[in-house]
UniProtKB/Swiss-Prot annotation:
DNA-binding region residue numbers: 4-73
Stated role: Plays a central role during spermatogenesis by repressing transposable elements and preventing their mobilization, which is essential for the germline integrity. Acts via the piRNA metabolic process, which mediates the repression of transposable elements during meiosis by forming complexes composed of piRNAs and Piwi proteins and governs the methylation and subsequent repression of transposons. Its association with piP-bodies suggests a participation in the secondary piRNAs metabolic process. Required for the localization of germ-cell factors to the meiotic nuage.
A Gene Ontology molecular function term of the record: sequence-specific DNA binding
Cellular compartments annotated: Cytoplasm; Nucleus
Protein name, UniProt field: Protein maelstrom homolog
Organism, scientific name: Bos taurus (Bovine)
Biological process annotations from GO: cell differentiation; male meiotic nuclear division; negative regulation of DNA-templated transcription; piRNA processing; regulation of miRNA-mediated gene silencing; regulatory ncRNA-mediated gene silencing; spermatogenesis
Family to which this protein belongs: Belongs to the maelstrom family.
Keyword set, alphabetical order: Cytoplasm, Developmental protein, Differentiation, DNA-binding, Meiosis, Nucleus, RNA-mediated gene silencing, Spermatogenesis
């Protein structure tokens, strides 16, 4: 039988349009066949009128090939097997853009580059069979550069009223309807004519943020498909271009998840700040900027300012590791008792535990002048005493007692009020 070229349906043109975005995300897609597994979920979210755009492209292609339009697109399977994938994608004259979507040829271009970090919170995630997967309730975005730090920010609550979410909430005047919010966001990230800048969010939030953007855009007369990329790819791209080395995604994620600024001032919106609520869409965006500044400032010789990180917290926690995991608590306690040279680390660790984020002090703040030889939780010492020989039982009665919030200053421990 003579060879026959595979027909192109609506799904083929949808996948072809998605290939540049998939490449920017670092996915190995050299042709349409490679991209099909990554596009099925986005295709399922499209409405019939949105799919009609790609169906029209398929009809025009068949007409140009001199073929009959044949049965309608609705009668064809969504994913048609491609017999000759190598013939389906036209050759590109230019190489695909790098991960960051920016030209990182020089340090100056990178330092002056503008980045937008975005996050959208939802009331929850609905089951897969529901047409509306998320209920957007809050949006935050910051304009950032390595040189200037956070240059501007945008924040708004999305009115969860009867017209959108069917969730009536009274006495909450800070919310706006979805059309107003998305139009204000457009004006924030694109105040002047020209190319729209790429927007970045964390990879774990990308599916939710991308869906909410498209959903909110349907309520507005202004339709703009924003280019949503991941912060992890941006950081990897910066390191790769600057140092010719690519850090692991796991390391980058840990870089963006530090907790030292969770309770810092001027990191949340006014409402969350006044009500002392940790979770805030604007705080997520500012935290991304803070983490990137803290990681790259010394590498590029940038002088940190309050626009880069909360300085009052950065200076106090400069020598304290924000996170610490002890895998073997028993061995750790024993090491602290037997090793005289371990006292410095012991004191530092005790200070870090005393500054667990409780609202009184930001996480990671180091309080100097507090020394303690307490060996940990009482249950640990109890188990040690049980396992010791009977001749040493009398030592248990002379052990120090664990620190508690009710220990008075006369026992050698300073209260929180005396440390401030």
């Amino acid at each position: 039988m003579p060879n026959r070229r595979a027909s192109r349906n609506a799904y083929y043109f949808f996948v072809q349009e998605k290939i540049p975005e998939l490449r920017r995300r670092g996915l190995p897609v050299a042709r349409v066949a490679d991209a099909i597994p990554y596009c099925s979920a986005d295709w399922a979210l499209l409405k019939e009128e949105e799919k009609e755009k790609y169906a029209e492209m398929a009809r025009e292609w068949r007409a140009a090939q001199g073929k009959d339009s044949g049965p309608s697109e609705k009668q064809k399977p969504v994913c048609t097997p491609l017999r000759k994938p190598g013939m389906l994608v036209p050759k590109q004259n230019v190489s695909p853009p790098d991960l960051s979507g920016l030209s990182l040829k020089s340090d100056q271009a990178l330092l002056g580059g503008i980045f937008y970090f975005l996050n959208i919170f939802s009331h929850g995630e609905l089951p897969p069979h529901c047409e509306q997967r998320f209920l957007p309730c809050e949006i935050g975005c910051v304009k950032y550069s390595l040189q200037e730090g956070i240059m501007a920010d945008f924040h708004s609550f999305i009115n969860p009223g009867d017209s959108s979410h069917k969730i009536p909430i009274s006495h909450f005047e800070s919310g706006h309807d979805q059309a107003t919010v998305i139009e204000n966001l457009y004006r924030f990230i694109h105040p002047n004519p020209g190319n729209w800048p790429p927007i970045y969010c964390k990879s774990d939030d990308r599916a939710r943020v991308n869906w909410c953007l498209k959903h909110m855009a349907k309520s507005s007369e202004i339709r703009q498909d924003l280019e949503l990329l991941t912060v992890e790819d941006l950081v990897v791209g910066i390191y790769q271009q600057k140092f010719l080395k690519e850090p692991s995604k796991t390391w980058v994620r840990s870089l963006l998840e530090v907790a030292m600024w969770d309770y810092s001032s001027n990191t949340r919106c006014k409402w969350h700040e006044e009500n002392d609520i940790l979770f805030c869409a604007l705080a997520v965006c500012k935290k991304i900027a803070n983490c990137i500044s803290n990681s790259l400032a010394t590498l590029f010789g940038i002088q940190l300012t309050e626009a880069h990180v909360p300085l009052q917290d950065y200076e106090a926690s400069n020598s304290v590791t924000p996170k610490m995991v002890v895998l073997d608590a028993g061995r750790y306690q024993k090491l602290r008792v037997e090793s005289p040279g371990f006292s410095h680390f012991s004191s530092s660790n005790q200070e870090q535990r005393s500054n667990t984020p409780t609202g009184d002090y930001p996480s990671g703040v180091k309080i100097s002048g507090q020394n303690s030889s307490v060996r940990g939780r009482g249950i640990t010492r109890l188990l040690e005493s049980i396992s010791s020989s009977s001749s040493n039982i009398h030592k248990f009665s002379n052990c120090e007692t664990p620190v508690s919030p009710y220990t008075s200053p006369k026992h050698g421990y300073k209260s929180f009020s005396s440390l401030s």
